[in-house]
Amino acid sequence: MSISSTIAPDLQAICRTALSRDVAASAPIGTGRNSRVFRVELSDGMRHEPAQVVVKFYRRDAGDVRDRLGTEFGTLKFLWQNGMRSVPRPIAVAPDRECAIYEFIAGEPVSPGAATAEDVDASVAFLAALRQLRGARGSEAVRPASEACFTLGEIVASVDQRVARLRSATSAGDDVARRLHDWIDATFAPLRDEIVEWCARTAGSCGIGFDDPIDREARTLSPSDFGFHNVIRRPDGSLAFVDFEYFGWDDPAKTIVDYLLHPGMALDDRLKHRFAERALAAFADVRSLPARARVVYPLFGLKWTAILLNDFLPERASQSDGDRRTTQFANARTFVAGLAGAYADNAFLS
C-alpha cells in the first residue's frame, strides 16, 4: 500500500487521536456516493488494537438529514454487544471529522453471479439472527430503517415521490432526459396505476388493509441495503456483512423482496427460490408474511425502477455522464418489462 497524499494528513491525525498510533500506509478500498473508505496499516503502538483497520469518511448531502455515521457505528456497537461476530467491530468514532474506525476484515467481495446456495443460507441465517435481537438490550434505541415503510400506502407514496423528482429533473433536459420523461408518461405511470390497483385488491382479499401498519412485533431489524454487494467472503469461506448506514426497524416483507429484486444481485431463479422459501420459514412467526411479501413485491419493483434512474436527478448531474444515463435508462426499461410480465404470478413468492 502507498499513502495517499490527499488524505494522509487526516488519517494521521485521526489515528493518532483515536488509537495513539501512526499511519504506516493506506490505500482506498471503496469510494461510494456516500462515503470514502480506506484500509490503513498502523505502526507499532497499542498492541491490543489490530495492525490494520478501516477508516470510513461519511458524506452529508445538502437536504439529507440522515446520520449515516451515527447509524452505522451505533448499529455495529449494538450488534457486537449482543454477540454478533459476522460484522466489523467498531473501534472508534470521530464525529467532528465525519469518520469512524472499524475492524479490517480480510477477504474478497462476493462477485455478482458467483453466490452459492451456502451463501444464500448464510444470508438467511444473518437475517434470522437480527430477528432474534428484536428484544435485546439496546434494541429500544434503534430507529426505523432508512425509507422504512410500514403500510402499503407508504410504499406507494415513496414511489410517487421519487418519480415526481424524476419528472421535474427531466422535463427540460437533454434528449435522453426528454425520452425518459416521455417513457414515464407512456409506460411507467400506467403500469404504476395497474400495479397499485392489483395490490389493493389482492391485499384486501388477504385481509391486509392498504393503510394499516404492520404490528410492531412483526417488524424486524434490517440492514435495509442487504445483499452480496455488501458482503465479504473471508479466507475460510464464511461471510462477513458490511455497510449498515441505513439499518433500523423495517417490514420483513421489504427485506425479503429487496433481496430478490436488487438489480446488482444477479441471482439465478434457483437461488431466488431457495432464499424466498428459507427466509419466509425463518420469519414464520410473522402473521400473513407470505401474502404481504407477494403484495409488496411489485410495489418495490416500481421503487427499484426509480432507483435505477437516480443518475437523472440534479444532485447526481456532476457525477453522471450521458453514456451512464443512457445505460441506466435501458436497464430501467428492461427491469420494468420483466416486472410487468410477472408481478401477478410471482414464481418466487407464490
Pin down the residues of each PLM region.
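An alpha-helical support segment within catalytic cores of ATP-dependent transferases
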Residues: 6-20, 135-224, 285, 289, ...
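ATP-binding pocket architecture of kinase catalytic cores
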Residues: 27-172
